């Protein structure tokens, strides 16, 4: 492992840059609060995050959010913003008069940002979100499983609740369930993708940063926090564009690209550091899984889960 000195931050194209960090397992990781975010922050990873933004847009009728916004000049937070692409999309194309705070451990957002976009480096596992934007109309979170300690999810939901405007503030939370599913048994008996998912989930469990999606548990946590009008939606994302449905094929094309970028990035640390794999063993498994997900006769899919909830007003 080589620690990068401050003067040697890795420059990126498109106005992005990487903060001081370190190379490990052949990838570049952030050095602010190391060990909290287990995935790389190099250019390949930034591309992966942007690809999944496209996946989620396609899966939701090209709408970056569905919650109603009832105030002019709304206040919005994007928790775990990554590259900031969701927040920038909202600022440029949906709500040009909004204040949008884009929160992440790593400052990997572009240098050129729209008015109203406020990047904020912050650890959302902190007990209080005091420095963050309050009285929000919308708090958006996605792909945070694996970035939050398993036992801290009630605290994260509580802090989101506290930072929403009573009566009109909404939370939207999106996650991918990485367990491969198939409704017609059209997948190989000894699936490399299934094996990858089992090992990845196990390794992340051992980090106490679970990525397993438990829909009812999340609903119960939202209810216990005090949210109302809770809605759950499940969207199929096929890993290969075999479907006769045009929209399903388009989602699958982008999901396949995103998945191809995800396999190695997400599983290097859990498989090497918790399950004892060598880096080349991980890459070989990922390559087999990648080839499998490109076979049209295999009808495997992953579920995308969406939770939407509202903070009630004082009289509700």
UniProtKB/Swiss-Prot annotation:
<keyword id="KW-0804">Transcription</keyword>
<dbReference type="GO" id="GO:0030435">
    <property type="term" value="P:sporulation resulting in formation of a cellular spore"/>
</dbReference>
<keyword id="KW-0949">S-adenosyl-L-methionine</keyword>
<comment type="subunit">
    <text>Component of the heterotrimeric velvet complex composed of LAE1, VE1 and VELB; VE1 acting as a bridging protein between LAE1 and VELB.</text>
</comment>
<comment type="function">
    <text>Methyltransferase that performs automethylation. No other methyl-accepting substrate has been identified yet. Component of the velvet transcription factor complex that acts as a global regulator for secondary metabolite gene expression. Controls the expression of the bikaverin, fumonisins, fusaric acid, and fusarins gene clusters; as well as two clusters for which the corresponding secondary metabolite is unknown.</text>
</comment>
<keyword id="KW-0749">Sporulation</keyword>
<keyword id="KW-0489">Methyltransferase</keyword>
<keyword id="KW-0808">Transferase</keyword>
<dbReference type="GO" id="GO:0032259">
    <property type="term" value="P:methylation"/>
</dbReference>
<protein>
    <recommendedName>
        <fullName>Secondary metabolism regulator LAE1</fullName>
        <ecNumber>2.1.1.-</ecNumber>
    </recommendedName>
</protein>
<dbReference type="GO" id="GO:0008168">
    <property type="term" value="F:methyltransferase activity"/>
</dbReference>
<comment type="similarity">
    <text>Belongs to the methyltransferase superfamily. LaeA methyltransferase family.</text>
</comment>
<dbReference type="InterPro" id="IPR029063">
    <property type="entry name" value="SAM-dependent_MTases_sf"/>
</dbReference>
<keyword id="KW-0805">Transcription regulation</keyword>
<dbReference type="GO" id="GO:0005634">
    <property type="term" value="C:nucleus"/>
</dbReference>
<keyword id="KW-0539">Nucleus</keyword>
<dbReference type="Pfam" id="PF13489">
    <property type="entry name" value="Methyltransf_23"/>
</dbReference>
